[in-house]
Curated annotation (Swiss-Prot):
Name of the gene: recF
SUPFAM superfamilies: P-loop containing nucleoside triphosphate hydrolases
GO cellular component: cytoplasm
Keywords noted in UniProt: ATP-binding, Cytoplasm, DNA damage, DNA repair, DNA replication, DNA-binding, Nucleotide-binding, SOS response
Native source species: Alkaliphilus oremlandii (strain OhILAs) (Clostridium oremlandii (strain OhILAs))
The protein's name in its UniProt record: DNA replication and repair protein RecF
Lineage: Bacteria, Bacillati, Bacillota, Clostridia, Peptostreptococcales
Subcellular location, record wording: Cytoplasm
PROSITE patterns: RECF_1 (PS00617), RECF_2 (PS00618)
Matches recorded under NCBIfam families: recf (TIGR00611)
InterPro entries in UniProt: DNA-binding_RecF, DNA-binding_RecF_CS, P-loop_NTPase, RecF/RecN/SMC_N, RecF_2
The family this protein is said to belong to: Belongs to the RecF family.
Entry binding sites for ATP: G30, D31, N32, A33, Q34, G35, K36, T37
One of the record's GO molecular function terms: ATP binding
Biological role: The RecF protein is involved in DNA metabolism; it is required for DNA replication and normal SOS inducibility. RecF binds preferentially to single-stranded, linear DNA. It also seems to bind ATP.
GO biological process: DNA replication; DNA synthesis involved in DNA repair; double-strand break repair; SOS response
């Protein structure tokens, strides 16, 4: 798919902006704090319904204004899709796809598929399991709305169960109905995540071999908190979760929260058999994340039938010239958006192969 046009009104430091994009490569170039990432963020917003930098939509609206408007036109193989987001400081945001208002956020997913790679993504290797769960969940949600709804349901049930445990410490509580529902939704989460990791691990391994010239072997391993076998069916997984919830009930009661279940899942990255988080060099960690992101491109292509768009925010300067070259020259079928402060990135790119946008204080020169 291709983002053909972007229109912004009162979005961050943009008052009014209309841009038409190149089908292959688009470069946003400029000094720090001019509005390069804001452009990437606005495109991402039309894909995910929220920013990747903040959970507060208010921050996206220009400081001196009360409303903001974002519109992208996406060209797909079989159709054109218009996505509109209206942000309002006094009420919830309005989303429209092809002029039809959306009732739930889940309806937006899948209209525009994006893969974002920014320096923040290093957290995926460096930080705790919640970053890796977020990665799995965001990526599965963009290819399966059923997963997205099951996850929201699971989180709601979990909140209820935790409240019950927290406010009834030392008292008898009837938790079984909640356990039943939690296990039913949780079992599906495990099935989806297991399936996703199975696919992405194969693609990431291939990708990593390619970028490291076969020197390194990357493994991506799913680590569910409730131990399940590779071929366990959903009913079996549900029983296993129920069993775990029962066994941990006294601990849960003491601590006032649910200590087992898919909300504690993790994913491990290994290079040549060693955990990248503990043993990987800075460069290896970066390359592992890059391989994972490039694997996502292929995974979405396989699931959706077209490549997603690729958003690269501030990552060029962090990659060596070989990897930079790969991103700029090898992804011929993927529309790519790059932010950079250096002209260097553009050298040996033919003018007809890209569009360059000089970003200066919320204006494009
Ligand atoms: N709600 C807002 N209203 C007005 N201006 C805003 C708003 N939010 C952010 N900005 C301005 O946007 C600018 C930052 O934009 P952005 O993050 O896109 O910079 P950048 O060009 O990517 O910079 P860098 O190279 O440092 O990453 C800042 O100057 C900031 O003051
Ligand atoms: Mg930036």
């Amino acid at each position: 798919m291709i983002v053909e046009e972007l229109k912004l009104i009162n979005y961050r430091n943009y008052e009014q902006m209309n841009l038409k994009f190149h089908p292959r490569l688009n470069v946003f170039i400029g000094d720090n704090a001019q509005g390069k990432t804001n452009l990437i963020e606005s495109i991402y917003l039309c894909s995910a319904g929220k920013s990747f930098r903040t959970n507060h939509d208010q921050e996206l609206i220009n400081m001196n204004k009360k409303q903001a408007y974002i519109h992208v036109k996406v060209k797909k193989v079989h159709s054109d899709v218009h996505i509109e987001v209206r942000l309002n400081s006094e009420r919830k945001k309005d989303l429209k796809v092809n002029q039809i208002p959306l009732v739930k956020m889940g309806e937006l997913l899948g209209n525009l598929n994006v893969v974002l790679f920014s320096p923040e993504d290093l957290k995926l290797v460096k930080e705790g399991p919640s970053e890796r769960r977020r990665f799995m969940d965001r990526e599965i949600s963009q290819i399966s709305t059923k997963f997205y709804y099951t996850l929201s349901q699971y989180n709601k049930i979990l909140q209820h169960r935790n409240k019950l445990l927290k406010y009834n410490k030392g008292k008898e509580i009837d938790i079984e109905v909640w356990d039943e529902q939690l296990a039913a939704a949780g079992a599906w989460l495990i099935v989806y995540r297991r399936n996703f990791i199975k696919k992405i691990s194969i693609l990431a391994k291939l990708m990593h071999r390619k970028i490291t010239e076969s020197i390194e072997n990357l493994e991506v391993i799913y680590e569910p908190n409730v131990k399940v076998k590779e071929n366990d069916e959903v009913d079996v997984i549900k029983e296993k979760i129920l069993q775990n919830l029962k066994e941990n009930f006294n601990v849960d009661k003491q601590r006032g929260l649910t200590t087992c279940g898919p909300h504690r899942d993790d994913m491990i990255l290994k290079i040549n058999g060693l955990d990248v988080k503990t043993y990987g060099s800075q460069g290896q960690q970066r390359t592992a994340v890059l391989s994972l992101k490039l694997a996502e491109l292929e995974l979405v292509k396989g699931e959706v039938g077209e490549y997603p768009i690729l958003l690269l925010d501030d990552v060029m300067s962090e990659l060596d010239s070989k990897r930079q070259h790969y991103l700029i020259h090898n992804l011929k079928s993927v529309q790519t958006f790059i932010t950079t402060t250096m002209m260097e990135t553009l050298k040996d790119l033919k003018p007809e192969d890209r569009a360059v946008f000089y970003v200066n204080k919320g204006q494009i020169d």
